[in-house]
Amino acid sequence: MSSENLPPDVIKRVVKELKELNSSTLEGITLLPCEEDITNIEAVVTGPAGTPYEGGYFKARLILSSDFPRSPPKANFITKIFHPNVSKKGEICVNTLKKDWTEDLGLKHILLTIKCLLIVPNAESSLNEDASRLLLENYDDYCKHAKLFTSIHASKPIIDSNNNNENSTTTPTTTTTATTPSTNTASISSPVKKKTETTNSTTTKVQPKKSLKRL
């Protein structure tokens, strides 16, 4: 959807929020602004330390509807992730974007909520039954699967030119090499909530060390 479909006051609000996000520092979140279409917002969420997503770079997308902010934006991960609240197509299920949505909630709040979802998954709002089951029944196995997905799909840092090609990603202009997250789950405690991606990067491609079994 083009930003032309948004009312002028909403466009002004979104532009202001995007400028504030660009000028501020959100730990673990990097905005990838698109000047051509402010209704298509992308950001990279860095996997939080102490979680099975640590060391990963996950591109997320927010799509603003024509009646935003009366209706919440649609959110999805472009980067593949093994998470109970994220479907295999990348759709994100979080209460902030559903029953808890209010018009005064801003883009910053939404992005922080998505990051927090990587820290405290909610097994009850499940979009991935396999991930939800492992989270509840065998947290160590859940961590192993999540870390494997992270090492395969999210181990390389992301900078996007903000076109609409989901596969058009490059590594950032730094010499730091992405590392594969450790598979040691002993130090990670279960955060289950119940009831309730200057120089070009190296040309060496990271290949997964083992194949992913079909869940």
Curated annotation (Swiss-Prot):
Catalyzes the covalent attachment of ubiquitin to other proteins. Acts as an essential factor of the anaphase promoting complex/cyclosome (APC/C), a cell cycle-regulated ubiquitin ligase that controls progression through mitosis. Acts by specifically elongating polyubiquitin chains initiated by the E2 enzyme ubch10 on APC/C substrates, enhancing the degradation of APC/C substrates by the proteasome and promoting mitotic exit. It catalyses: S-ubiquitinyl-[E1 ubiquitin-activating enzyme]-L-cysteine + [E2 ubiquitin-conjugating enzyme]-L-cysteine = [E1 ubiquitin-activating enzyme]-L-cysteine + S-ubiquitinyl-[E2 ubiquitin-conjugating enzyme]-L-cysteine. PROSITE patterns: UBC_1 (PS00183), UBC_2 (PS50127). Pathway: Protein modification; protein ubiquitination. This is Ubiquitin-conjugating enzyme E2 S. The active site is at C93 (glycyl thioester intermediate). One of its GO terms (molecular function) is ATP binding. It comes from Dictyostelium discoideum. Its EC number is 2.3.2.23. The lineage of its organism: Eukaryota, Amoebozoa, Evosea, Eumycetozoa, Dictyostelia. InterPro entries: Ub_conjugating_enzyme, UBQ-conjugat_E2_core, UBQ-conjugating_AS, UBQ-conjugating_enzyme/RWD. GO terms for biological process: cell division; protein polyubiquitination; ubiquitin-dependent protein catabolic process. The gene is ube2s. One of its GO terms (cellular component) is nucleus. CDD domains: UBCc_UBE2S. Belongs to the ubiquitin-conjugating enzyme family. Keywords: ATP-binding, Cell cycle, Cell division, Nucleotide-binding, Transferase, Ubl conjugation pathway. Residues 159-215 are annotated as: Disordered. Residues 9-155 form the UBC core domain.
